Amino acid sequence: MPLLDSFTVDHTRMNAPAVRVAKSMATPKGDTITVFDLRFCVPNKEILSERGIHTLEHLFAGFMRDHLNSDSVEIIDISPMGCRTGFYMSLIGTPSESVVADAWLAAMQDVLNVVAQADIPELNEYQCGTYEMHSLEQAQEIARNIIAAGINVNRNDDLSLSDEILKGL
């Protein structure tokens, strides 16, 4: 099985909250697709709550589009990581980490501005596979923590696992 890019970085050295360019690729038509690692929690030390991350999934995707989409950037998808330490965001374009961090902070403020659970988009059995597994309170707690901590940048060069380590795993 091929080694995926996300498993070639040392998770023991990741900072959080932090933005990382996980991957960049060109399409056959010449557009650039960039995948960002939006790390909310330090791997193997913290985890996002099940209900909180699910509610963030519903809110974060729209709010990030509000703050990041432009003539040169279009978000394709924002999805939670299976390890529940953050989200992957795939987009067309090449925004800098600082631009992404600013959009992320603005989106977290938007999460804090949501008044009631009923205001969570697509919160119904037709549009959500586990529509009862949500908590606006937990999502807002996550948002407060991100805003209070600020957002750093993780760089692949600082986190890459050596070939020697990878061969031994």
From Swiss-Prot:
InterPro entries: LuxS_sf, Metalloenz_LuxS/M16, S-ribosylhomocysteinase. Fe cation binds at residues 54, 58, 128. Its cofactor is Fe cation. One of its GO terms (molecular function) is S-ribosylhomocysteine lyase activity. GO terms for biological process: quorum sensing. Its EC number is 4.4.1.21. It catalyses: S-(5-deoxy-D-ribos-5-yl)-L-homocysteine = (S)-4,5-dihydroxypentane-2,3-dione + L-homocysteine. Keywords: Autoinducer synthesis, Iron, Lyase, Metal-binding, Quorum sensing. It comes from the Bacteria. Binds 1 Fe cation per subunit. Transmembrane segments: none annotated. It is an enzyme of class 4 (lyase). Involved in the synthesis of autoinducer 2 (AI-2) which is secreted by bacteria and is used to communicate both the cell density and the metabolic potential of the environment. The regulation of gene expression in response to changes in cell density is called quorum sensing. Catalyzes the transformation of S-ribosylhomocysteine (RHC) to homocysteine (HC) and 4,5-dihydroxy-2,3-pentadione (DPD). Homodimer. NCBIfam families: PRK02260.1-2. Belongs to the LuxS family. This is S-ribosylhomocysteine lyase. It comes from Shewanella pealeana (strain ATCC 700345 / ANG-SQ1).
